[in-house]
Amino acid sequence: MGRKRLITDSYPVVKRREGSAGHSKGELAPDLGEEPLPLSVDEEELELLRQFDLAWQYGPCTGITRLQRWHRAEQMGLKPPPEVHQVLQSHPGDPRFQCSLWHFYPL
């Protein structure tokens, strides 16, 4: 039986020169100077509702609307944010606002 072969026996080792031609380790990507666009009012409200969906201290959010969850949390004395209730009242028929983050995923 012969000696075990290593992968480097089949492929030559190529050492690359480190120098100023490329970037060295530890360099950060160049700053593009672009500022993120400010969110629209609807996007800010939807982000608030997403955060409400992800806050488990108000109970589970699958199978019920956000407004039902808000009312249930209030009845249980969990003190849900009043801003969430205001947003939900201002968009009564819009499923983007009324349905939870997980609504479109099958159970």
Curated annotation (Swiss-Prot):
Biased composition regions of type Basic and acidic residues, renumbered to the chain: 15-28
PTM field: Ubiquitinated; undergoes 'Lys-48'-linked ubiquitination in response to UV irradiation, leading to proteasomal degradation. This modification is partly mediated by RNF8 and by the DCX(DTL) E3 ubiquitin ligase complex (also called CRL4(CDT2)). Efficient degradation requires the presence of PCNA and is required for the inhibition of fork progression after DNA damage.
Keywords on record: DNA damage, DNA excision, DNA repair, DNA replication, Nucleus, Ubl conjugation
Motif PCNA-interaction protein motif (PIP box) location, chain numbering: 1-16
GO CC annotations on file: delta DNA polymerase complex
Name the record gives this protein: DNA polymerase delta subunit 4
Protein's job: As a component of the tetrameric DNA polymerase delta 4 complex (Pol-delta4), plays a role in high fidelity genome replication and repair. Within this complex, increases the rate of DNA synthesis and decreases fidelity by regulating POLD1 polymerase and proofreading 3' to 5' exonuclease activity. Pol-delta4 participates in Okazaki fragment processing, through both the short flap pathway, as well as a nick translation system.
Main subcellular location: nucleus
Annotated stretches, region: Disordered: 1-35
Similarity-based family: Belongs to the DNA polymerase delta subunit 4 family.
Subcellular location: Nucleus
Lineage start: Eukaryota, Metazoa, Chordata, Craniata, Vertebrata
InterPro entries: DNA_pol_delta_4
GO BP annotation list: DNA biosynthetic process; DNA synthesis involved in DNA repair; DNA-templated DNA replication
Subunit structure: Component of the tetrameric DNA polymerase delta complex (Pol-delta4), which consists of POLD1/p125, POLD2/p50, POLD3/p66/p68 and POLD4/p12, with POLD1 bearing DNA polymerase and 3' to 5' proofreading exonuclease activities. Within this complex, directly interacts with POLD1 and POLD2. Directly interacts with PCNA, as do POLD1 and POLD3; this interaction stimulates Pol-delta4 polymerase activity.
